[in-house]
Amino acid sequence: MDTHQSFNENQHPNFNSGNHGGINMNRFQRFSKPTISPIQQQQQPQPQQPSSIIQRQSIIMTQPQPQPQPQMIPIFREPNEWYKLIDMEMNKFNNESRPSPEYIKYLTQLFQQALDSLEHKNTPEFYLFLLNRATFQSKIGENEDAKGTLKYMKVLKMESFEVFVLLSEIESKSFRFSKARSIINRGIQKIPSRSKEFEGFLMVIDIQEDEFSRNGCIISNNNNISFNNGDVNNNSIIMNENDQPMVINLNPQQQQQQQQQPYEISSSSSLMSTPASSRHLSNRSSIVPTPNSSTKLSESIKTIGLRSVQPRRVIHKQTTTNFNTTTTTIPENSYDDDADQPMDHDGNNNNNFRIHSNNNNNSSANSSYNKSENDEDDQDEEDEEEEDEDEDDDEEDEEEYEDNNNNNNNNNNNNNNNNNNNNNNNNNNYFKYNRQQYILNNDSDTSTNPNSPASSNSSVNDIINSISITDDSKLDYENNVKLQQQQQQQQQQQQQQQQQQQQQQQQQYIQQQQQQQPKIHPQRFSLQNNTPTTTTTTTAATNVQNPSSSSSYISPPLSSQSSELQHQRRHSIQAQRANKPPVIPPPSKLHQNNLQQQQQQQQQQQQQQQQQQQQQLLLQQQALLQQQQQQQILLQQQQQQQQQQQQQQQQQKQQEQQLKKTNMQPPPPKQPQPQTQTQQQQKNINNSEIVDKEKSFEVAKSWSEVAMVNGKPYLRIEFIGKGGSGKVYKVLSGDLKIYALKYVCLSDPNEIEAQLNEIEMLKRLRKQVNIIQLIDYEVNMAKNYILLVLEFGEIDLSKLLQRLQTPNGTNVNFIRIYWQQMLQAVHTIHEEKIIHGDLKPANFVSVQGSLKLIDFGIAKAIQSDDTTNIVRESQIGTINYISPEALIDTSQGGPKQCMKLGRASDIWSLGCILYEMAFGYPPFKSFSNIISKYQAIINPHHKIEFPVHPNENLLKVLKLCLIRNPHERPTIPTLLNHDFLKI
């Protein structure tokens, strides 16, 4: 009986283990694991397997006939119980260094049971469950199953930062670095907020790929090691390479040889300098021996599905030559910092290396050395750098020493000294003392060089002992150095005295030569070291006169002396070099010309940069001037329009007053005057223009839709916008004028009432300049629509503010002009005893440069007490600009809300619009939740924040308009006379 079928019959009817939410979960797993209850698990016999066999959880054991599994009683838990249990077990699993195979099997079954019982939905809890399952599968080596779980998370739209990182880590374990990198790049596209962390993982992938290309494996990644299920005493290790295990078995002879002898490695191996390699070497004792003693090391390496690259577990190298055999060996405990250092047969410390050399009976002794570098010891690297610098100084000192000997004509001593130095260099090969002791076992006699006096008095071992300095003799060495410094100072004083004597003798000799020969060729003297080299008699004379000085200063050290004399010579030469003044050669003409050319080029570059900067500044200034001119032109135009509007209003008032005085008597009709020829010509021109317009309009009908309003055609040009149940189009009339056509569908009774109310208000305000003009309208109740032909506005105030908004805020001059026009428009409707009730930036449109008020759907007439009652089933107006009193219900429990509003309610809305013009956002924009925003508006204790603004008068106007008490708010005339509008 199939395990999944038996489990599906007994599980809860709401869940389906094979098909979760229409998705087959089994296709995301490489194989399905049987579900076994804990009781049946104890009853099943556990097969005994040898400890040398290494098993992995991910290997599928193919059998000819699958064994039938006993039917399991499903365990039903609440989802929270499953999540808590999985979380607890994963914490326990992460804390264990070597989880047992039984515990791994238990966790596998636990995850399977939870997966079958939980509902597969995109929830945070189920996301954590699947992420824990993928992490667990990756840690136990089930990389394919982990990838299947992560792919299933992608199907459930659970793409997160952790999913991409875990997928890329699995691919990098399998050395598919390009795929891992593509996964991280996909994660950067999906989750750009975590791009910095993704870039860090890209760097890790590059490092791993570099290690893999150099070493054949990832040394720094220690997560690729898992332990065998067998006996712990065997200490068998499996290293996952290309998602495949590798088993290394050694026979007993090889294991015994490894325990007795240190492991042999190549001195050029890069593993010696890395801390990670030391951990691999320390685990080499855990390689499992096999009972077969006749097999070799190469035969004992059994790879299971390995690719071209194999992990470097043991590096064995032995070089043989015709003359000598050299093997570098490392003790097992040489990489442990706390372990004691092994002792050689003489009782000396060996730090990390021993050198065993077997020399044949040849004519010359060939010494080989090895240099070890430890990255963990920074002091060793500094010592080596200092030694390299000392070697360079030695070479320079030897050259200077040879020059001094040549100047003093001590060629014989100089040749002996060079021979001694060459012999010493050939023998010791610059052995370094770097906190390590080198022991050279010389088993054969060395041949001597008859030309060198050192070969008869000292051997190779004496030279090494004279050069190498151990850790125990460092204090003695420092004391000797101090004594040498004192001796050097004394020698320097003696040398200075000798030089003074030589200079005096030279001056005397030069005076004698000048007396004998008044004309001397300039080439007979050389200025090297201030000593004449014209004849050999002078140097001979000085040598005869000062035999002690020449012997004490020029005599080279014999080869039988120790290295202390070499150190003395080195310090004396360094002291002489320090006392010499630096020789600065005069600059050549070519060098001077080059310097002049460079200076000229630099000056030219600086001049070009200055010119470019000046041009940029000029361009910026010109752009600013153009902007200022445009602003001034706009201001002048708006001021002219305002003056014209004021004049028209004054004329209307005067006409009304005259009508009142004349008791509403109409003026007498004008008598028709005879038409002149010019008037007739104008009429003819107008008639011809009308004919042309009609023709063009008829042509335009062929390519555009036509809307009929009261029998008049209007061509639809483009769609402007929509709001509620209405749509607005840009149309062209028969006389070729642009208008706005508003189409409203009468599906809601409230909408019908609002549109009819707007028509009445616009008809009432038809003669007002600051109000949008109603051109024509049609109400068709049979077809449930209303058509309104309105004056066309180019742009509303909301979009205009977005264009004018800058990082420094909107220009105060623009705010002042638009604020004045808004006040005049609202003052017009207040004079007609109308309250708008829904003032916002979108309800002010710009018509040929001037702002006009639109949307009178909820406007109401004011009653006798300067207020009006607005009854609605829901709130009215836009909440960002609505006044507190418009949100307070005064119906006292009635079926509909009743708000009592006045002119002060529109003042509050104007203040909110001015706040947005000044700071870029309305006063209650910070509250994202509509309920919290509602409570903040009606709360009298909530203080509105007023940011800092350079114009103090603007802040004063804002604070006056946003007073919570409507009786304390200013009126429109007060705001028009405020200092803010005075330029």
UniProtKB/Swiss-Prot annotation:
Return one GO MF term: protein serine/threonine/tyrosine kinase activity
The reaction(s) this protein catalyses: L-seryl-[protein] + ATP = O-phospho-L-seryl-[protein] + ADP + H(+); L-threonyl-[protein] + ATP = O-phospho-L-threonyl-[protein] + ADP + H(+)
What are the disulphide bonds in this sequence? none
User: What region holds the Protein kinase domain?
Assistant: 714-981
GO terms in the biological process aspect are:
chromosome segregation; meiotic spindle assembly checkpoint signaling; mitotic spindle assembly checkpoint signaling; protein localization to kinetochore
**What residue spans carry the Acidic residues bias annotation?**
374-403
Which residues of this UniProt protein bind ATP?
Answer: I720, G721, K722, G723, G724, S725, G726, K727, V728, K742
Q: Which Gene3D superfamilies match?
A: Phosphorylase Kinase, domain 1, Transferase(Phosphotransferase) domain 1
Q: What is its EC number?
A: 2.7.11.1
Report the PROSITE patterns cross-referenced here: PROTEIN_KINASE_ATP, PROTEIN_KINASE_DOM
Coiled-coil blocks: 380-430, 474-517, 588-665
- UniProt record similarity statement: Belongs to the protein kinase superfamily. Ser/Thr protein kinase family.
Identification of the protein by name: Probable serine/threonine-protein kinase mps1
